[in-house]
């Protein structure tokens, strides 16, 4: 119903409405003639509205509505800053060998960006927060970075044996099933290459 009530006002008188909409409190209290001009100016295009009171009330409601939206946007921005660290930690903790080749190159350049922004954000309000790691402000960032880095190192350390161990198990099974060594070599090479290429 906001758009329905404000559509005629905005179309006919966008400048004055915009001014009063942003400075409703100041204009009404500090400048009485402004409030009078507002009621007089809004009276011509008040045909859909019953009285001059709804515009002032709806303007106040709109200001509160805008303030709520700004607060929500700030909360969303804070959540977005926290999300990269959580997603990075989650990606680092998932021990999936198939996605590791895709995650490891993305995570190495991806880790410094959120960490730098968080550390800079801590440096601006209180430099001591970063120097003393025991403070709660710096502790989450350092621990999260350490966890992500440790998990990333563990994944990278696990990938060479994981790439080596799977070929051994099919090689044993193929040795028992396929007697000819030539067929075993062709099968193991082609199947292993196809597995890790895909």
Curated annotation (Swiss-Prot):
Biological processes, Gene Ontology terms: segmentation
Region (Disordered): 16-117, 152-198
GO MF: DNA binding; zinc ion binding
One Gene Ontology cellular component annotation held by this UniProt entry: nucleus
Residue ranges crossing the lipid bilayer per the database entry: none
Domain of life, source organism: Eukaryota
Biased composition (Basic and acidic residues): 179-198
Swiss-Prot/TrEMBL keywords: Developmental protein, DNA-binding, Gap protein, Metal-binding, Nucleus, Repeat, Zinc, Zinc-finger
UniProt biased composition (Low complexity): 35-46, 68-83
Bias kind Polar residues: ranges: 95-105
Compositionally biased intervals (Basic residues): 17-31
Subcellular location: Nucleus
Main localization category: nucleus
Keyword Nucleus recorded: yes
Keyword tRNA processing in record: no
Recorded family membership: Belongs to the hunchback C2H2-type zinc-finger protein family.
Function as written in the Swiss-Prot or TrEMBL entry: Gap class segmentation protein that controls development of head structures.
Protein name (Swiss-Prot/TrEMBL): Protein hunchback
């Amino acid at each position: 119903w906001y758009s329905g009530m404000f559509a005629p006002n905005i179309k006919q008188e966008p400048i004055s409405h915009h001014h009063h909409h942003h400075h409703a409190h100041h204009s009404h209290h500090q400048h009485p003639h402004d409030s009078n001009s507002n009621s007089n100016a809004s009276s011509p295009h008040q045909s859909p509205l019953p009285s001059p009171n709804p515009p002032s009330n709806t303007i106040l409601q709109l200001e509160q509505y805008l303030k709520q939206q700004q607060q929500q946007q700030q909360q969303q921005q804070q959540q977005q800053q926290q999300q990269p660290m959580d997603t990075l930690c989650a990606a680092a903790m998932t021990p999936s060998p198939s996605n590791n080749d895709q995650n490891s190159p993305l995570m190495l350049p991806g880790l410094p960006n959120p960490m730098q922004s968080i550390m800079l954000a801590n440096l601006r309000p209180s430099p001591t927060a970063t120097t003393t790691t025991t403070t709660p402000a710096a502790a989450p960032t350092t621990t999260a970075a350490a966890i992500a880095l440790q998990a990333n190192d563990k994944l990278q350390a696990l990938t060479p044996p994981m790439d080596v161990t799977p070929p051994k198990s099919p090689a044993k099974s193929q040795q028992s099933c396929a007697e000819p060594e030539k067929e075993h070599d062709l099968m193991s090479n082609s199947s292993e290459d196809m597995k890790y290429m895909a």
